[in-house]
Amino acid sequence: EVPVIIRNMDQDTAVRAMVDSNLQRPNILPSEKAFAYRMKMEAMNHQGTSGGISAKDIGKNANDSARQVYRYIRLTYLMNDLLNAVDRDVIGLQVGVELSYLTVPEQEMVEEVHESTGKYPSLEQAKKIRQHREEKTLILL
């Protein structure tokens, strides 16, 4: 037998409770943390409580700064292949964040280059790719 506490709560409160519980796990993948933070932020926005609770408050329980919470949330915009590379620590978190600003076709281009060369961009290269994208000078081959 396992002791159980049953609580009556709405969907958004249940999401927040589930996310808080999952973030306490000792070994959590970057993608899991990313989606947990995003779900919690969305639940709080839906409840209209985001004004009182910030990204800083969300990250506090997991010892992450507000800036780090936003970085993790950015990872949720990566296509699966790139996100899996972050989870496997083949791509660093910050490189993943930079690549998350690219469109899906642009991210696919990065993955195609990886498949042909076996390499992902460095942080400096990822920043340059993002800069070209924002300046609309990135050309897809």
Model-inferred region functions:
Residues R38-M41, A66-L141:
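Amphipathic alpha-helical extensions and coiled-coil-like segments
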Residues V2-L78, N84, S100-Y101:
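Amphipathic, charge-rich alpha-helical segments that serve as recognition/docking helices
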